[in-house]
From Swiss-Prot:
It comes from the Eukaryota. The modification Phosphothreonine is found at residue 49. It is a peripheral membrane protein. This is Protein ZEO1. Residues 1-16 have a biased composition (Polar residues).
Length: 113
């Protein structure tokens, strides 16, 4: 029985050793995969960062252009309002002057008639 026990214990020790080796191997492989993944992520970030910055600059330029166009449009609207107001005032003044001149002409005509 002792020989069978020895063989069983030896087999158990062999299995235990193989399990430990497998565990260590898996841990090493896991660490390698993790490091490769981190390196890949870093590479992707490094590649994407300049492109993202360029896109951000372009978006800012577009936003600045839109803001400038809005300001220009608002200024044109204000200028148009001022011109319209001036035209209305001028028309009113002209109408008043025209009415005054008509009355004056009538008075002059009545004096000479």
């Amino acid at each position: 029985m002792s020989e069978i026990q020895n063989k069983a214990e030896t087999a158990a020790q062999d299995v235990q050793q193989k399990l430990e080796e497998t565990k260590e191997s898996l841990q090493n492989k896991g660490q390698e995969v993790k490091e490769q993944a981190e390196a890949s992520i870093d590479n992707l970030k490094n590649e994407a960062t300049p492109e993202a910055e360029q896109v951000k600059k372009e978006e800012q330029n577009i936003a600045d252009g839109v803001e400038q166009k809005k300001t220009e449009a608002a200024n044109k609207v204000e200028e148009t309002k001022k011109q319209a107001s001036a035209a209305v005032s001028e028309k009113k003044e002209t109408k008043k002057e025209g009415g005054f001149l008509k009355k004056l002409n009538r008075k002059i005509a009545s004096i000479f008639n």
